[in-house]
Amino acid sequence: MRSNVGVWKSLFMKEEFVGDNENPSTYLVEALAHCSECHTPRNMFGAMKTKQWMRGASNPSGKGKIPSIHPDDLKWTKEEIAEYLSSGLTPNYDVAGGNMALVVENLSKLSKEDLLLIASYIKNVK
């Protein structure tokens, strides 16, 4: 089994790591908040489909779908995204539920500046 992990890593793990001069929004989203872990679909081996970055995925519980937060689909402003991440309220006054409620609980402790950096990253996903 352990040798299979090495094969998986060689196929799917990025070799580059976040460096000292990395863009702070990239660091916040990809390293700390790890938004893509839920919002990016996976292949049959459990690796993220990077060509569908942040385009939504099946819910691991088997019920429903994790929504796309790709800018083609999520039409919120940066300020609305930052507000959602700090309060859990959508622009339509819906509330974050499930695991996202836990994410909001943790992200709400970040500064407004950091939340806007996360929102900026999300608005600029290609």
What residue ranges belong to the model's regions?
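Protein kinase-like catalytic domain
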Residues: 29, 39, 86-89, 126
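Short glycine/proline-rich turn/loop motifs
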Residues: 19, 98-103
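The canonical Cys-X-X-Cys-His
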Residues: 25, 32-42, 118
